């Protein structure tokens, strides 16, 4: 089931219209792409044009269905005061529709500026890849994690927050952590997962002139 589900997700994403290079994240020295997204914890929209003149760190995450991304957003909130004191704005783009995101963060507020991008267009514009699964028997060289065989993905084991009793396969770890958090995916979360389940994450520091200064 896992094999067929992820091949379907990967095929669906591959048919979409990507903005920018979907497998090569922007690098230092390159111009940050234009974006304008609705704010989750503010009124109105936030855009690159509106941020010009101020350096900012932007994190591009999966949706709320991903327990690892929920934790990374919290961690980003912990470093926000230090970044703010250095004159750097902190933004997090989450792959969840606006109203669903607002409901969640109403009860779990964060000091960082949250933006909603259910279509992952900003992720694509910054070149943040999704996992592309190689056909079975392919001679292409895997480039983990952006390009992998299904066998490699199924064999992977993760426990980055050390909350699990032992490292688990990525999708299995999602289920365990969501259960630990008491987080139940609703229809909106399920739809986002079905469309963007293989999306990866990225962080970019953009200077006051709109140029990428650091990327991870």
Regions found by a protein language model. Give the residues of each.
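Short loop/turn microsegments at loop-to-beta-strand junctions
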Residues: 33, 55, 200-202
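Structural microenvironment flanking redox-active thiols in thiol-disulfide oxidoreductases
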Residues: 72-125, 162-163
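Thiol/selenol-based redox catalytic cores and closely related redox-interacting motifs
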Residues: 117-216
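N-terminal targeting signals for export/organelle localization
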Residues: 1-38
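Hydrophobic alpha-helical segments, especially N-terminal targeting/anchoring helices
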Residues: 38-40, 206
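Residue-level signal for well-ordered, solvent-exposed loop/turn and beta-edge residues enriched
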Residues: 30, 43-44, 211
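Catalytic metal- and UDP-sugar-binding loop of GT-A-like glycosyltransferases, i.e.
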Residues: 60, 93, 206
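Short active-site neighborhood of thiol/selenol oxidoreductases, capturing the structured segment around
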Residues: 46-77, 89-90
């Amino acid at each position: 089931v896992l094999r067929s589900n992820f091949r379907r997700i990967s095929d669906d994403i591959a048919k979409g219209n990507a903005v920018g290079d979907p497998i090569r994240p922007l690098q230092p020295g390159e111009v940050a792409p234009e974006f304008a997204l609705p704010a989750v914890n503010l009124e109105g929209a936030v855009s690159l044009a509106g941020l010009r003149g101020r350096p900012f760190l932007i994190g591009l995450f999966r949706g709320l269905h991903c327990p690892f991304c929920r934790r990374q957003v919290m961690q980003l909130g912990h470093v926000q005061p230090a970044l703010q004191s250095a004159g750097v704005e902190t933004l997090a783009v989450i792959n969840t529709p606006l109203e669903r995101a607002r409901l969640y963060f109403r009860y779990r507020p964060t000091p960082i500026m949250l933006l909603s991008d259910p279509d992952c267009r900003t992720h694509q514009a910054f070149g943040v890849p999704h996992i592309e699964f190689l056909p079975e028997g392919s001679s292409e060289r895997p480039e983990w994690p952006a390009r992998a065989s299904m066998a490699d993905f199924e064999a992977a084991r993760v426990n980055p927050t050390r909350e699990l009793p032992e490292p688990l396969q990525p999708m299995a770890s999602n289920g365990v952590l969501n259960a630990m958090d008491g987080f139940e995916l609703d229809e909106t979360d399920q739809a986002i997962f079905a469309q963007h389940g293989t999306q990866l994450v990225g962080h970019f520091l953009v200077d006051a002139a709109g140029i990428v200064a650091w990327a991870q």
